[in-house]
């Protein structure tokens, strides 16, 4: 299956992949390991069943080129989940209370997703995740209080068929002010 040649199916798959990668790319973190404020998550090296997916910039470009009503609907859905499109990736706001807790709620609380830290070795943490239509393992590397990376491998069912997927994500702190990106509640 070539994801790049089917515009409608590609768009649906890319929307699902954006949601999937956002949920999987944000592991739990320890108290005050990260700065509060606006964060940008950029995914790369995304593969489904061994096939390389288009670059994140291309996927974001496709979403930016949606008809105005579809784009507004997509942006509203993301806003309700506490994220927005911006720059090179997906943006999320973390409050001081969130970074001081042991649980950074970047995934939608209503999504049914859970994450569990399975090993901590300094600034490298391994974790497992489980969502209604995805599960797998990952590793987070905290480079500083303003940057971390994750690598995840798992299975998901975004199209009605079980698929294997993997991706890398880089998360960077953009600053203390979140602007119009509301924090997760």
Each model region followed by its residue ranges:
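Sec-dependent N-terminal signal peptides
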Residues: 17-25
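Subset-of-secretome marker
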Residues: 32-185
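Short, Lys/Arg-enriched N-terminal segments with co-localized hydrophobic residues
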Residues: 1-12
């Amino acid at each position: 299956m070539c994801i790049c040649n089917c515009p409608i199916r590609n768009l649906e798959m890319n929307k699902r992949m954006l949601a999937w990668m956002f949920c999987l790319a944000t592991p739990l973190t320890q108290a005050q390991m990260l700065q509060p404020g606006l964060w940008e998550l950029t995914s790369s090296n995304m593969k489904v069943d061994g096939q390389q997916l288009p670059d994140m910039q291309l996927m974001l470009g496709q979403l930016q080129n949606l008809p105005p009503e579809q784009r507004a609907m997509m942006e509203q859905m993301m806003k309700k989940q506490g994220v927005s499109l911006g720059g090179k990736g997906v943006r999320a706001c973390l409050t001081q209370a969130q970074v001081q807790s042991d649980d950074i709620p970047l995934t939608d609380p209503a999504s049914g997703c859970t994450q569990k830290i399975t090993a901590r070795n300094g600034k490298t943490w391994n974790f497992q995740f489980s969502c209604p239509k995805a599960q797998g393992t990952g590793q987070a590397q905290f480079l500083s209080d303003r940057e971390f990376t994750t690598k995840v491998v798992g299975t998901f069912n975004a199209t009605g068929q079980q698929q294997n997927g993997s991706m890398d994500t880089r998360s960077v702190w953009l600053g203390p002010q979140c602007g119009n990106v509301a924090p997760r509640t």
